[in-house]
Amino acid sequence: IRGVADAHRKYRKELVSLSDKNIRIALDEWNYWYGDYIYGELGVRYHHKDALGVAIGLHEFFRNSDIYFMANYAQTVNVIGCIKTTNTKSGFAATGLPLKLYRNHFGTIPVFIDDEYDDLDIVAALDPSMNKITVSIVNIAQDNKSISLDFGTTSIRPDGRQWLIHNSDPEAYNVPGEKPNIRIEEANITLRERRLSIPGYAILVLEAEIE
């Protein structure tokens, strides 16, 4: 995702024919595809590690939203899908959970992040009304990580919410009709100390109101 965006930025600089044009990228399909066909043709099983990858993929689209106009996740049901079915049951595969989480709770106005952490992929965004900020962190390491939150001159209310997708086993997966091994967990949190702990192999989305 990043490589395609970087290549198109290079084309814009080097090709005179593009100097006066704003041609953006419409990515026709993106997803993982591997493994046995458990849910029919191309009906592969997705694991928690794939959910982490999907979240990081979304992060790259957010960072490059100036040049990506559209990106279509492939697919929806069974065929490399984020929803899996049997004859009588259906349920979210691991990869469907970050798609659902970000769609429901992540902001739409990107915010610049000026720091980097080993094993952590971080993005932030404001909601359309600019009254809330969301911060998303993906921890690809086995160990828990802790970071400090610095919102600069922006005043943040001391209480917030978080949504967490976590499993200590990156190979964990969900089965339709059974209790999910991977799910979205919501909790109220305090931001008074501006410290945040992220479990290993986790996707964490934080929401805070701006005063």
Say what each PLM segment does.
Residues E116-D118, S129, A141-D143, R183-R194:
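Ser/Thr- and Asn-enriched, surface-exposed coil loops between beta-strands
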Residues I210-E211:
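Short, charged beta-turn/beta-strand-edge "cap" motif at the junction between a beta-strand
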Residues T154-I198:
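Acidic, Ser/Thr/Pro-rich beta/coil linker or hinge segments at domain junctions
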Residues D20-K132:
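Aromatic/acidic polysaccharide-binding cleft in carbohydrate-active enzymes
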Residues Y11-L15, G57-F61, L120-A124, S136, ...:
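Generic recognition of flexible, low-complexity loop/linker segments
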Residues I1-L15, R24-D28, Y32, G57:
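Extended catalytic-interface subdomain
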Residues E14-D20, D66, T154-S155:
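Short helix-capping segments at alpha-helix termini
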Residues D119-I156, Q162, A202-E207:
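Carbohydrate-binding surface patches
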